[in-house]
Amino acid sequence: MKALEIGNVKITSGFWKEYQELILKKVIPYQWDILNDKVKGIEKSHAIDNFRIAAGISNDKFYGEAYQDSDLYKWLEAVGNALQVENNIELEKKADEVIDLLEGAQEEDGYLNTYFKLVEPEKKWSNILECHELYCAGHLIEAAIAYYKGTGKDKILKIACKLADCINEKFGPEEWKMHGYPGHQELELALVKLYDLTNENKYLKLAEYFIDMRGTNQFFEEEFIKRKRICHWTKCKVEEPNRRYNQFPYQEYNQFHQPVRMQKKATGHAVRAVYMYTAMADLAYHNGDKELLDSCKSLWDNITNKQIYINGSIGSTPSGEAFTKDYDLPNDTNYSETCAALGMIFFTFKMLQNFEQSCYADTIEYIFYNAVLSGLGLDGEHFFYANPMEMLPRRRDRKSVV
């Protein structure tokens, strides 16, 4: 079973046509204004300005986090998908200008990350666990694929492939390479998509390497010791990474507590988990890997039978934005991140491709109509990052999810 391309499906009327129009006409332009810091009353993005600085066009200072680039990449992916639905010359022109910035910011060896280029260039590849270099790369790859499909233009695809090649030179089984894997999973699923588009086997092999290595060594602990146990976020020495914002051991939080083929129960940060499971299921589909697929089946069954809310959302605690334990589904403290619901759809679609059974299609529909749509306001300008099942107006701390 293969997915139809977005451009091969035309929605002409009804419920989903209204949502499609909302995305095309309101959400994408509004997010463009946010990325350009034109919307008052919200935290500034500076994402585009960061690329202007990195490209040598602006003398301003970097603003944001190590993962700031990913916001722009997600917008570019949305634009690429939108252009597969209908032509929009003005939108395409804006995207092309952004892609020129990406090209100018990319380093000679393919490396591309504005935070590490502008703020801590000496620390590139030194904190894979916390700093999202590989996560951002994954979102760039997905954006490049979508934009290539939407326009036929390959400039951003060449940028993405150059970055993927840079990563391939840095990570792998060879003795002189780093024997690690992404702290925040995302790159793995993107590499499989890149293989599907380019038919370059090296991208599939790199995705396999990241999945196969996870949980088999002490890479994250070793790099933690090398940086003298300093946390990126607090700049202070800590006993364990990530403990600042979650209650779980970081091995489970980051899903490297076991090799992936031994993992049978969903645990840790929900978005990281389902992104990884998506890549696992996609690799199983490509390679006929029964052992990997068996693990995916156990993980999917665990989530859908024991760790999912009635509305199809996942992640029952804001502490680590995470899964907790079987049947622990409180309504007053759940997190239910919108990204996690989308990731669960990605995972479930790959399971549908593998098994071709209606339970997977039904689950996609169930999550889409409930846990995903709840994250987007009907005006296209208001969003829920997390989706509380229950919230008292006087509980200001719960309002932080809006």
Label each region the model flagged.
Residues M1-V402:
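Glycan-recognition and catalytic cores of secretory/periplasmic carbohydrate-active enzymes
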